[in-house]
Amino acid sequence: EQGGFYRSGKRGKLTQIEISAVVVCCHGGPGEDGSLQALFDLAGIRYTGPSQAGAAVGMDKLAFSGTMEAAGISSLPLHLITTDLELDEQGPLIVKPRFGGSSIGIEIVDDLPTAKALASSQPLLRNGAVVQRYLDDAIDLNISVRTYPEKSLSAIERPLRPEEDGIYSYADKYLTGSQGMASAPRELPAELPADIEGQLRTMASQVVDLAMVRSVARIDFLWNSAGLW
């Protein structure tokens, strides 16, 4: 049997669909967590974006954080919420779904007991929840990368979140204008000290290799007076 996709015609006759490569433009879910990539691997079809392993690491916040920490790259400590979890950090804390993105399901809480209660009751956290210290004075910084024909980095962008909102929410990203995230307010290029810009670019290049980034991707950072993560 030859791999690939087939179209079923009259009398059940199968005709192979010729596919040179698939441009993956999925946002979230099976299209971004490695499931679709695994299907293409099994079918012997080339595709854009990360491999199955790279996609899985990128969608799993706990795995990604552990990979960065093991490599010595600055990353805010992240913890899986369990009934017996204990933390030295004081609140506020930020609770996130272990899997997924776009700030969906993210909430700020005052303490660990509240985080645990939220993890056990919030439907968006049923597949796992993680918690880390919330930095109310940090700013968001993004950089895009391209790995072909060679690794290259974009200008650094600073998304501008509303002052009254504690997090850069899904609504801030996608519902602020008619063009979705393209309409979201931003500072581009971000005005940063030269040493911070250099540090961010170095870290982004390291993340590309560690997280098996392939094709085009965006890497997000937080920065305040204490450091860059």
Labelled PLM ranges:
Residues 1-53, 57-63, 82-85:
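ATP-binding N-terminal substructure of ATP-dependent carboxylate-amine bond-forming enzymes
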Residues 12-16, 55-140, 147-150, 198-201:
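Active-site nucleotide/adenylate-binding loops and adjacent lid/helix of ATP-dependent enzymes
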Residues 112-202, 228-229:
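Phosphate-binding site of ATP-dependent enzymes
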Residues 28, 103, 161:
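Glycine-rich phosphate/pyrophosphate-binding beta-alpha loops
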Residues 7, 133, 145, 221-223:
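Conserved hydrophobic "DFG−1" position in protein kinase catalytic cores
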Residues 208-229:
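Conserved metal-phosphate-binding beta-hairpin within the catalytic cores
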